[in-house]
């Protein structure tokens, strides 16, 4: 199969593209096929084409919170990074954003408007689509608290507007995970009318707190493990003596133990083996099994 563009579009269809540059960990093999749609119709066309060809579909936003196998990803990988549109409704205080819009940029934009509600997303290295799927959260807030609805591309290729209450939200999860339902845009309910200077200051404080406590000098995927009930994953890992522990070129961060760093030249298998080692060591010490927040994509057998 040799195609320059998706059928009926001007959207380039690329073959055997390294995904390392599409992830915040800078690891991973090649996508069998890769497409970077700039519009919702192009994304629909990509989805329908993959279904017609019998290809599995993987969606990437900012490439955080995921680990791509060194063996690559079969089928079609859809990058949403160009779906970055944003509209505001000044009367209702609602904000509608494309799935590829970066969360830090969104926080700064709403702060400039004097709209409260998304100050906490400023330090999350992800996109709107990923936040909706994962119920991203920080500083005691999460996506589900402000989300009104999402536009979903359903498995049959149709679009549906789905209310937030129908997305089955819980801690760092939704019923969109492990499905072929794709988030295309989200509408949030914010609180307009505040002093922009004050909202900017609060946003900057959240960012400063994250920069002070979390590692940003090396590639990483964000928090690796979910916090078990009654515990924090970082504390458990630190108390197990694993800060700085390294397999290959992947290392448990000295600054925050719930982060794994690519210290230069790490492979996805280095990271994977380190994740498994940490899980086993913590379970042996505390009888607590750490469940990954990071999503594994591809074959790690």
From Swiss-Prot:
Span of domain FAD-binding PCMH-type: 26-206
Keywords on record: Cell cycle, Cell division, Cell shape, Cell wall biogenesis/degradation, Cytoplasm, FAD, Flavoprotein, NADP, Oxidoreductase, Peptidoglycan synthesis
Chief place where the protein resides: cytoplasm
Cofactor(s) annotated in UniProt: FAD
Intrachain S-S bonds: none
Biological or metabolic pathway of the protein: Cell wall biogenesis; peptidoglycan biosynthesis
Any single GO BP term: cell wall organization
EC number: 1.3.1.98
Keyword Cell cycle: yes
Function summary: Cell wall formation.
GO cellular component: cytosol
Any one GO molecular function term: FAD binding
Domain of life: Bacteria
Protein name: UDP-N-acetylenolpyruvoylglucosamine reductase
Similarity field: Belongs to the MurB family.
Source lineage: Bacteria, Bacillati, Cyanobacteriota, Cyanophyceae, Acaryochloridales
Catalytic activity: UDP-N-acetyl-alpha-D-muramate + NADP(+) = UDP-N-acetyl-3-O-(1-carboxyvinyl)-alpha-D-glucosamine + NADPH + H(+)
Catalytic machinery residues: 172, 223 (proton donor), 293
UniProt KW Transmembrane helix keyword: no
Compartments it resides in: Cytoplasm
């Amino acid at each position: 199969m040799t195609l320059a563009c998706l059928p009926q579009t001007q959207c380039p269809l690329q073959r055997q593209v390294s995904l390392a540059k599409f992830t915040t960990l800078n690891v991973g093999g090649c996508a069998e096929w890769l497409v970077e749609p700039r519009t919702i119709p192009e994304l629909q066309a990509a989805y329908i084409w993959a279904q017609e060809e019998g290809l599995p579909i993987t969606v990437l936003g900012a490439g955080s919170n995921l680990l791509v196998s060194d063996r690559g990803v079969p089928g079609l990988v859809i990058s949403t990074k160009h779906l970055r549109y944003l509209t505001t409704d000044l009367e209702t205080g609602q904000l509608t954003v494309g799935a590829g819009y970066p969360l830090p940029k969104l926080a700064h934009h709403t702060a400039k408007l004097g709209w409260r509600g998304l100050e906490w997303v400023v330090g999350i290295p992800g996109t709107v689509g990923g936040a909706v799927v994962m119920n991203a959260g920080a500083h005691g807030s999460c996506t589900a608290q402000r989300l009104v609805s999402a536009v979903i591309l359903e498995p049959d290729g149709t679009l549906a507007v789905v209310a937030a209450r129908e997305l089955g939200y819980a801690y760092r999860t939704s019923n969109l995970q492990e499905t072929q339902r794709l988030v295309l845009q989200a509408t949030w309910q914010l609180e307009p009318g505040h002093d922009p200077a004050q909202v900017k200051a609060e946003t900057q404080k959240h960012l400063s707190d994250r920069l002070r406590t979390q590692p940003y000098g090396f590639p990483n995927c964000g928090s690796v493990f979910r916090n078990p009930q009654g515990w924090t994953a970082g504390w458990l890992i630190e108390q197990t003596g694993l800060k700085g522990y390294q397999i290959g070129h992947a290392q448990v961060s000295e600054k925050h133990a719930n982060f794994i760093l690519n210290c230069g030249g790490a492979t996805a298998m280095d990271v994977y083996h380190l994740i498994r080692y940490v899980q086993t060591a913590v379970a042996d010490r505390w009888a607590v099994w750490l469940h990954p927040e990071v999503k594994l994509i591809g074959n790690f057998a």
